[in-house]
């Protein structure tokens, strides 16, 4: 594939739609010169969510380990030291969150599309997102608040982490 034709997958999550941020989010990608190739609004089922987030067999282990590390970095005790047990809880919360309303699925194309989109989106942990990123500018949630409430973090958007993942 030609470098200028690199594609990436982006999904605006239910909270982004609920807050009417669709146009703002799309504009951010257009302003850097990316081309919108496909767009579709769908309502995800819990099964769709599980398929989407767990295609990589390492995802469950890595997610659990990152979650445990996040607790420890904050001086908190994780609810479990078993990464797979932690991920099961994360996935259950994610299924509820992602199937609570419609999502917008998009494919964007352009040079270095994956890296550019990841920079524009910001860190998955909203409090770590830089000002100027989508999450840094519009998300008021945090891992700590979502953990306290027993729910998934509301971070507006999903973006593929690699060309392989985007495919």
Please state what every model-predicted region is.
Residues 1-167:
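Non-catalytic terminal and connector segments of soluble metabolic enzymes
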């Amino acid at each position: 594939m030609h470098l200028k034709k690199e594609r990436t997958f982006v999904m605006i999550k239910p909270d982004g739609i609920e807050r009417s941020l669709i146009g703002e989010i799309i504009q951010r990608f257009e302003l850097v010169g990316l081309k919108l190739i496909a767009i579709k609004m769908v309502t995800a089922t819990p099964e769709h969510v599980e398929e989407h987030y767990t295609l990589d067999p390492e995802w469950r282990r890595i997610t659990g380990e990152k979650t445990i590390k996040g607790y420890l970095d904050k001086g908190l005790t994780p609810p479990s030291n078993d990464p797979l047990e932690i991920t099961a809880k994360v996935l259950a919360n994610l299924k509820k969150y992602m199937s609570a309303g419609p999502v917008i699925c998009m494919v964007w194309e352009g040079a270095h599309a994956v890296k550019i989109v990841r920079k524009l989106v910001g860190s998955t942990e909203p409090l770590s997102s830089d000002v100027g990123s989508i999450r840094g500018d519009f998300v008021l949630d945090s891992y700590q608040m979502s953990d306290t409430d027993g729910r998934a973090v509301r971070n507006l958007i999903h973006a593929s982490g690699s060309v392989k993942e985007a495919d």
